Amino acid sequence: MKIAIIDYDAGNLTNVVRAATRAGLDVVVTRDPEEIREANAMILPGVGAMKDAMDHLSGYGLTDIIREEVRKGKKLAGICLGMQALYEVSEEGGEVPALGLLPGRIVHCPEGNLKVPHMGWNELVMHRPHEVLAGLPEKSYVYFVHSYYKTPGDSEDIIASADYGVTVPAVVGKDNVLGFQFHPEKSGPVGLRIWKNLAEWLEK
């Protein structure tokens, strides 16, 4: 099976490709619509600002392709900014329309006693079972780097969260769409297990 890692000039491709390959996935890094259509599943990585990300996706003609393939039932996993892009709108850079594959908004992490951006290790709090988190230790810590987060108001899609003064949705998903706010590829042995689980999920 071929997994398309979507390249839209939004960073962290090298680490994601390395982790995906280590997990046993056969990947192609591409922004070519036909290669994305021909792939069996998709990964949308990303770091940076939402407006730039959506401008790049749109500029490469990929927004409609991604939506179309998801509607057909193709699996999609978003990582960090790629997860945030799954939602309807982001406050980062104004009111930025995103892919709209999941309901909800991306908002700024609240300023207070905790530093923003949120950088560091946090424990995953499980909300419901999902195969992508199978076999993790009881206390599993993963690595976050972000200033914006998905409001937890639409809680049905939350698989796991982290506490950072607010409830930060950490793993989200519905049907053939999954998202990770943290970086599994930077999360040590726990992240490696998540990548192996993700590989199995993508290939089903």
Task: Identify the residue ranges that each predicted region occupies.
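Extreme N-terminal starter segment of soluble prokaryotic enzymes
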Residues: 1-4
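Short acidic low-complexity segments
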Residues: 27-38
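Structural motif
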Residues: 43-45
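Cysteine-nucleophile active-site neighborhood
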Residues: 48-121
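Pocket-forming structural segment of enzyme catalytic cores
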Residues: 88-164
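Short, surface-exposed beta-strand/loop micro-motifs that present aromatic residues
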Residues: 166-173
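Acyltransferase
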Residues: 180-204
